[in-house]
Amino acid sequence: MSEDNGTINLEEFKNSFLKNYGGSAESVQLFSSPARINIIGEHIDYNGGKVFPAAIDRYMYFAIRKRADTKVIYNDLKFPGTFEFNINENFAYKKENDYANYLNGILSIIKKRGYKFDSGFEVLIDSTVPAGGGISSSSALECGFAYAVSELFGFGISRKDIALIGQQSEHEFMDVKCGIMDQYIIATAKKGTAELLDCEKIEHEYVPLEMGDSCFVVMNTKKKRLLSESKYNERREQCETALAQLKAAATPLPAGGKFSNTKDLPDLCSLTVEQFNAVSSILKDDVIMRRARHAVTENERVLKAVEVLQKGDLNELGKLLKEAHHSMQYDFEATGIELDTLAEAANAQEGCIGARMTGGGFGGCAIAIVKKDKADAFIENVQKIYTQKIGHDAGFFKCVPADGVSRI
């Protein structure tokens, strides 16, 4: 595996499959499924805003083949041990099944939706996606597996439904209440683009994202995100409080947005920045006001990002990333010393066009847009600063926008 481009040797991968399962190579089918980043648009999917993710060229790989019996067998080159099940069983979550739970969850939902399996199958998995790195290794696993199974058995499940099956499996099988962004971008992405995604309507538009002589660098804090769920819920409640207070005040709004009175607002992101500034004094609690201000300004940054990329202007996108980090740090207070150190160190480097934290915050990852010829020096310098300040290394890799789940 090459660290630089995140690909594997497919011939070796196929040979590993045959070593595990025997037989001949002709009926083995290969698939890939990418990781993802959210370029801009944090904590606004539940405030009526749009997100702006891209798939990246780090992949999960699947080699899969039908069997003559009803056995389902999983092997993963990154995790020891073989898991064996029967396609006709009622799959249930079991802690000891480890990563196999993600796969069984997908099979359980596919069966629930009425698809019939005429045999079992065997699968081998490999990956260049760092696990637990905040770039959706679990969604890449789920969607890639769902797509591979759908293709192998001729189910013809649409890309949108692949995403929805992944989300349904998280909700019903894994008991994780996730949004749709991760699965959706992984299932539907196109190389050289990002997606403006409306998570409420589940609709997207492709926006050109030609990197030219630049690339993304993903920077992983390697901080365990223990507090993230309770903090996430707290932030969500604060936004709901802000909306409730604005609606209760029933105040006229200046022109320019979709609504003329705060009482009619369905969500915070329906406000323009100008409208919000005109009524923000209704929010007496400074914390509540700042949480709402983040949602409104972040939504506007997403729309601006789309505008500047349609003109191919990466420099303007870089400025928006810096503003977005500042808003997450001071208005939303969802960064922490690790992410702030990475973003600050990154933005100070030569060749860095802009950097910000990405994902839910409180640990996880940051992203930077960096000139390709400066990327190695960038990584070295940021690593040095981070290690000195935080006391342990961060993880880094370079990437560019990539296709969604694919047959190889």
Predicted regions, residues:
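Gly/Ser-rich oxyanion-binding loop with an adjacent helix/lid
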Residues: 1-31, 38-50, 84-89, 96-209, ...
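C-terminal nucleotide
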Residues: 2-36, 61, 65-96, 193-252, ...
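Short Gly/aromatic-enriched secondary-structure transition segments
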Residues: 48-55, 235-236
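Short, charge-rich binding segments
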Residues: 53-55, 63-66, 114-115
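FabD-like malonyl-/acyl-CoA
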Residues: 139-140, 365-369
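Glycine-rich phosphate-binding loop
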Residues: 362
